[in-house]
Amino acid sequence: MANQIYLFSLICLSVLLCQSYTVSSFQKSLDLAKPCKRFVLHLHDIAYDGDNAANATSAAIVNPLGLGDFSFGKFVIMDDPVTMDQNYLSKPVARVQGFFCYHGKATYDAWIAWTVVFNSTQHKGAFTIMGENPFMEPTRDLPIVGGTGDFIMTRGIATLTTDHIDGSKYFRVKLDIKLYECYH
């Protein structure tokens, strides 16, 4: 248990040290009605259940601590395919790599750190989504806090909608990406 807490603390510290904001000396007005880039993606997650190592795209590396009914303390790492449509078998256009941890003791709640990594003819680079994901809500807005490549220093909003759940083995999330600072 001490090793799990140490591992969790080390991962959180690494994320905080790797993410930084660039402060500029000028204010740029943002038109929230007109993002500079917008696209809709679909994340597909297959949870590891002990028998599906070849197909699993996520795995719990710290299990719930038994402190309630809402998986408090569970820590999941993921490398999920992202498609342009809802079909899991469609060609992936990106991957979501990162983690989420359940941190609500009174309701299902997760804090996420995801990097959407593109390597296609259309886009190269990545952007990062971080924040509170109250996934029992129909839609959730999470901040996009930066990026690389085609998404260098981008900022925006990712609106998440869980559009399919198959027990604890599979879920699909629609990502409505709206970027408001674009340099490419």
From Swiss-Prot:
Disulfide bond listed as a keyword: yes
InterPro entries recorded: Allene_oxi_cyc_Dirigent, Dirigent
Glycosylation sites: N55, N119
Principal subcellular localisation of the protein: secreted
Record key words, sorted: Apoplast, Disulfide bond, Glycoprotein, Secreted, Signal
Biological process terms in GO annotation: phenylpropanoid biosynthetic process
Cellular component terms per the entry's GO annotation: apoplast
Secreted as UniProt keyword: yes
Disulfide bridge partners, by residue number: C36-C182
Localisation per UniProt entry: Secreted, Extracellular space, Apoplast
Signal peptide stretch: 1-20
Pfam families, sorted: Dirigent
Quaternary structure and interacting proteins, as annotated: Homodimer.
PANTHER family attached to this UniProt entry: DIRIGENT PROTEIN, DIRIGENT PROTEIN 12-RELATED
Family recorded in the similarity comment: Belongs to the plant dirigent protein family.
Role played: Dirigent proteins impart stereoselectivity on the phenoxy radical-coupling reaction, yielding optically active lignans from two molecules of coniferyl alcohol in the biosynthesis of lignans, flavonolignans, and alkaloids and thus plays a central role in plant secondary metabolism.
Name recorded for this polypeptide: Dirigent protein 14
Gene: DIR14
